[in-house]
Swiss-Prot record:
Organism ancestry: Bacteria, Pseudomonadati, Pseudomonadota, Alphaproteobacteria, Acetobacterales
Family indicated by similarity: Belongs to the PRA-CH family.
Swiss-Prot/TrEMBL keywords: Amino-acid biosynthesis, Cytoplasm, Histidine biosynthesis, Hydrolase, Magnesium, Metal-binding, Zinc
Protein's cellular compartments: Cytoplasm
Pathway: Amino-acid biosynthesis; L-histidine biosynthesis; L-histidine from 5-phospho-alpha-D-ribose 1-diphosphate: step 3/9
Record's function text: Catalyzes the hydrolysis of the adenine ring of phosphoribosyl-AMP.
Known EC number: 3.5.4.19
Listed cofactors: Mg(2+); Zn(2+)
Pfam families in the record: PRA-CH (PF01502)
Name of the protein in question: Phosphoribosyl-AMP cyclohydrolase
UniProt source species: Gluconobacter oxydans (strain 621H) (Gluconobacter suboxydans)
Length: 156
């Protein structure tokens, strides 16, 4: 489909250290067709996984139809904040934006994987990834340290 970049090409670009593939948004009518095929849950949401081009999973969030539409049309990742009940444009307050490189829907059409160009860190704790609690035989262990403090990240 025209709305995704070729993953093989992306992998070659990343391995050479070249610039990322530029996301080319589909026409609004194609975005509407894609969204019509998505199976949103009873709350009108799908899970949205953000992954860096090197394969690191950055975060898991939620999207409603409006967030998915905005993301696909603009290439700037937008989520749905369940706690604030409003659109959450990643990096709006912190500057830690995500630019879409590629989007893929899963086989059930109820989850989206986004390969993103992450500015700064993805996690509100100041870490690159939100997935830093490693499970060990002795319990949980932090697998990474913050790259930036919350005070620096949010100016608090």
């Amino acid at each position: 489909m025209q709305w995704t970049a070729a993953f093989g090409s992306l992998a070659r670009l990343v391995s050479r250290g070249d610039a990322f593939v530029t996301y080319v948004p589909p026409a609004p009518s194609i975005v509407d067709d894609i969204i019509a095929q998505v199976k949103f849950d009873a709350n009108g949401l799908i899970s949205a996984l953000a992954q860096a081009p090197d394969g690191v999973v950055l975060m898991l969030a939620w999207m409603n139809a409006d967030a998915l539409r905005e993301t696909l049309l603009t290439g700037r990742v937008c989520y749905w904040s369940r706690s604030r009940q409003k659109l959450w444009r990643k990096g709006e307050t912190s500057g830690q934006q995500q630019k879409l490189i590629e989007a893929r829907l899963d086989c059930d059409m109820d989850a989206v994987l986004m390969i993103v160009d992450q500015t700064g860190v993805a996690c509100h704790t100041g870490r690159r990834s939100c997935f830093y609690h490693g499970v060990t035989p002795d319990g949980l262990r932090d697998t990474s340290q913050p790259e930036i403090s919350a005070e620096e990240l949010y100016g608090r």
